[in-house]
Amino acid sequence: MSRCLSIQRTLVTPPDREKFAVRLQRKHAHYAQAGCRYWVFEETGLRGAFLEFCEAPDAATLARAHASAPERVLDPARLYHEVELP
């Protein structure tokens, strides 16, 4: 089975950046403990627009990690799987 990925978009206002950074650290620790990789990117042209990526070796691992996440995942059923190229 191929790797699976989820993507979540979040908009953060300037006064909330510090709290958001703490939340990201907590999520990073959670997903690492669950056997997943977690990345966050901020849009270059729109400060405060973030994309969060969580990757797992399979859909079941990612679903378990989302189910026990420290914050609710907006659409936990929306998963993307890696496409094997010929």
Residue locations for each model-derived region?
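Short S/T/G/P-rich N-terminal loop/turn motif that feeds into the first structured element of a domain
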Residues: 1-86
